[in-house]
């Protein structure tokens, strides 16, 4: 064999063994073979996909694309995607070695996605679910403003429709190119989950895959009612080398693995990929009859300043509302009036007497359907509200409460 032939064979072998990740949009020139990251065995990509990207030699779970994950979990022809065309922008005009816009364009062309998550609804063994799947191939699955917005919208939709939420996490953390806008998504998603879990009493299952790190781990990834993980998944916040350099200590070999977290009580279950759909199906079947499950209601609060039309509607509502459906916001009004009664007692002593009587008559609300009308038209109460916070603030507060409970005044 000549030297040129040997070099050519080595080049072809290197091309075949290169670890490529095929998406449906990928070009065939990316290769037909890949190598296991754990044992190094060469794997035929077509057969690897059929085995859900689990190594035939050692059982190691290689990374899956979000599309492959959805196909493995959702029943055929039931997937309905949300917000497919929502695309990130570059608010900070960030640039390191390459402009952020160029990185986004490259990732979108390579993966066929607009950002690092796919969200939507579908059926899992006939059970309706709201599903979000992160894709590590898109800029390391980093969480930017679009990822946070899509996940938040998914959770809010699930809350309104009474659906369980399943999020499959695979991320390197918050996206540094978007700065504080990416960090804000941690709080936004967590707030939506609080309403979904604690107010609507609906189920949220978090599936942790390798890797799940950074701001995703510090927020919604670890907030699930149930935490599932794949075997040997890398799960943590800071990197291993960063921790070792900070502590000046050698960490255990299995540190930040799914097995390590399960041993220390931070996970509920480690599920092999081939059994994940079955485990989720059995869990959802058990939860389906839960007595506390209910369709949710999301309190949005006031959105922007009052318009002149809305302000006039609220003024009329203060004078003429007689409908019992508004009575459920009286408790909040009583709390506000109680606070005013404690802070302004020296100027209007008669107001304090009225408010104290109001606090001691809890059953009054049930007996009198016109309580809300009398409360708002009371001269003493009007004086208290106007004195403490002014008419405009009172209208803003009322607008907030009506919007929170999705009430539209009838005029």
Swiss-Prot record:
One of its GO terms (molecular function) is ATP binding. Pathway: Lipid metabolism; malonyl-CoA biosynthesis; malonyl-CoA from acetyl-CoA: step 1/1. Its main location: plastid. Keywords: ATP-binding, Chloroplast, Fatty acid biosynthesis, Fatty acid metabolism, Lipid biosynthesis, Lipid metabolism, Metal-binding, Nucleotide-binding, Plastid, Transferase, Zinc, Zinc-finger. It catalyses: N(6)-carboxybiotinyl-L-lysyl-[protein] + acetyl-CoA = N(6)-biotinyl-L-lysyl-[protein] + malonyl-CoA. It is found in: Plastid, Chloroplast stroma. Binds 1 zinc ion per subunit. Residues 32-302 form the CoA carboxyltransferase N-terminal domain. Its EC number is 2.1.3.15. GO terms for cellular component: acetyl-CoA carboxylase complex; chloroplast stroma. Zn(2+) binds at residues 36, 39, 55, 58. GO terms for biological process: fatty acid biosynthetic process; malonyl-CoA biosynthetic process. Its cofactor is Zn(2+). Belongs to the AccD/PCCB family. Acetyl-CoA carboxylase is a heterohexamer composed of biotin carboxyl carrier protein, biotin carboxylase and 2 subunits each of ACCase subunit alpha and ACCase plastid-coded subunit beta (accD). NCBIfam families: accD. PANTHER family: ACETYL-COENZYME A CARBOXYLASE CARBOXYL TRANSFERASE SUBUNIT BETA, CHLOROPLASTIC. This is Acetyl-coenzyme A carboxylase carboxyl transferase subunit beta, chloroplastic. The gene is accD.
């Amino acid at each position: 064999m000549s030297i040129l032939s040997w070099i050519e064979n080595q080049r072809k072998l290197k091309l075949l063994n290169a670890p490529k990740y095929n998406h449906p949009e990928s070009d065939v020139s990316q290769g037909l073979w890949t190598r296991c990251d754990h044992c190094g065995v060469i794997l035929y990509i077509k057969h690897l996909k059929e085995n859900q990207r689990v190594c035939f030699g050692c059982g190691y779970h290689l990374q899956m694309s979000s599309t492959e994950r959805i196909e493995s979990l959702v029943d055929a022809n039931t997937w309905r995607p949300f917000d497919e065309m929502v695309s990130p922008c570059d608010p900070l005009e960030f640039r390191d070695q390459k402009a952020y816009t160029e990185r986004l364009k490259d990732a979108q062309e390579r993966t066929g996605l607009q950002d690092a998550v796919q969200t939507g609804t579908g059926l899992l063994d006939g059970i309706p679910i709201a599903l979000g799947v992160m894709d590590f191939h898109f800029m390391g699955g980093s969480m930017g403003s679009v990822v946070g917005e899509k996940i938040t919208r998914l959770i809010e939709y699930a809350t309104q429709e009474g659906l369980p939420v399943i999020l499959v996490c695979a991320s390197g953390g918050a996206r540094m190119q978007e700065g504080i806008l990416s960090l804000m998504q941690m709080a936004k998603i967590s707030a939506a989950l609080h309403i979904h879990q604690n107010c609507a009493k609906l189920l949220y299952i978090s599936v942790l895959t390798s890797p799940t790190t950074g701001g995703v781990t510090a927020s919604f990834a670890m907030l699930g009612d149930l935490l599932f993980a794949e075997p040997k998944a890398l799960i943590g916040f800071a990197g291993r080398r960063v921790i070792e350099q900070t502590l000046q200590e050698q960490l255990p070999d299995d540190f930040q693995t799914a097995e390590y977290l399960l041993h220390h009580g931070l996970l509920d279950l480690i599920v092999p990929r081939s059994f994940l759909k079955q485990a989720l199906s059995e869990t959802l079947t058990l939860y389906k009859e839960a007595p506390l499950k209910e369709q949710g209601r999301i309190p949005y609060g006031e959105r922007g300043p009052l318009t002149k039309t809305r302000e006039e509607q609220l003024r009329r509502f203060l004078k003429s509302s007689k409908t019992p459906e508004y009575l459920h916001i009286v408790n909040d009004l009583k709390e506000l009036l109680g606070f005013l009664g404690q802070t302004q007692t020296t100027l209007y002593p008669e107001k304090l007497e009225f408010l104290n009587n109001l606090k001691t008559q809890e059953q009054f609300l049930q007996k009198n359907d016109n309580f809300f009308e009398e409360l708002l038209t009371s001269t003493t109460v009007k004086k208290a509200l106007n004195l403490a916070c002014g008419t405009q603030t009172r209208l803003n507060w009322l607008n907030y409460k009506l919007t929170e409970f999705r009430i539209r005044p009838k005029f």
